[in-house]
Amino acid sequence: MRSRIFTGAAALAAAALVMTGCAGTTETPEGTAAPGGLQIDVPDVPMLDALGDNEGSVDIVAWSGFVEPAWSDAFTEETGCVVNRRVAGTSDEMVQLMRTGDYDLVSASGDASLRLIAGGDVAPLNLDLIENFGDDIVEGMKGQLYDTINGKSYGIPIGRGANILQYNSEVVTEEPTSWDVAWEADSPYAGKIIAYDAPIYIADAAVYLMATQPDLGITNPYALDQTQLDAAIELLKTQNGIVSEYWADPAAQITSFAGGNTVVGTSWEVLRKLTEDDKFKSVLPEEGSTGWSDAWMLSSESDSPNCAYAWMDYTGSPEVNGAIAMNFGMAPANAAFCDTSDEAAAHCEYYNATDEEYFEKVWFWTTPIEQCIDGRTDVQCTNFQQWTDAWLTVKG
């Protein structure tokens, strides 16, 4: 679950996803799932064949900062589609809202997209109808496992970011190279460590275990059998003993670092930037990290599919996609934005927008499901409901 407005995260349990179907993913040399490699049974939702007349309005569920008058007003003038925005604070809230059938589009993260696809809540997309989905979209955001199923695309990329290790360089005087400073019981910064507060954070523990306990056989942090999940929870309980606080509210995370209660822990690049203090540094540790990637997804019950397609195309342009990325604080999906101005180039450099080598180390949030997405067929993996239940045991 992801919190993207300055409110506390809701602790809502998601319905378990029970998947059946063919074997799972193939693996690339970097160990990430091959695009569209997951084969599972999902509802047969039709794809739009051709565009028609715009309906006059479009209802969108989005993260704060993704739908703003600075670009939505121009869209309305251009298309005649009035934009009605509903800001959501968590992925769970987005899933619930999309299941009402009242919204046409959602800016879904990877920890929501598989739930929406499996529930038949979103429709596959006809990419031929979206002109701005082209060669300028960064390769690392095309055909990803969290929004591409059975060879069909369900999402139009918006932006991405890594869950980085942030530290106070006046206290942590040597740049950390490992997550061990945040996970090990003997960390010299025990009692000054901050951790993310959500079930999906179990994947962060799994990433660390992939490097430190290879005998567990974890090859994808979102594909954990019961033994692997138990190991991740044990590590999280160990970390609980050295954590000063957990954060879901970005404002609280910034305050914790700025006030000195925290000196090291999980962060986003935009949060470090918002501290406006050069003593706060960040690093992507050698073990890699988790991360998030957002995409527009179309409701299977949309009353305004033409306006929705128009919005996905409009916001996919270099200028508008870049405006969204700069407004929120993330790497844009459209690399052409990086060449539009010196300011754009600086933004892209700060957020590693076109650095695929950087993002190859990032495991983007993906909904855990019972079918093992690492390709194993001889074991059942744990699903998001099990992760949610397990997370509740971490903090006691």
Residue ranges of each PLM-predicted region?
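Early extracytoplasmic/lumenal segment of secretory-pathway proteins
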Residues: 36-116
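A bilobed periplasmic-binding-protein/Venus flytrap-type ligand-binding module shared by bacterial periplasmic
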Residues: 166-171, 207-209, 292-305, 323-327
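Bacterial lipoprotein signal-peptidase II cleavage site
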Residues: 19-32
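Conserved C-terminal helix/tail region of periplasmic/extracytoplasmic solute-binding proteins
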Residues: 361-396
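Mature extracytoplasmic/periplasmic domains
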Residues: 299-368
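A ligand-binding cleft/hinge motif common to bilobed small-molecule-binding domains
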Residues: 112-117, 265-279
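Periplasmic-binding protein-like
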Residues: 131-135, 233-239, 277-300
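Extracytoplasmic ligand-binding site segments that recognize negatively charged/polar headgroups
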Residues: 61, 66-68, 107-256
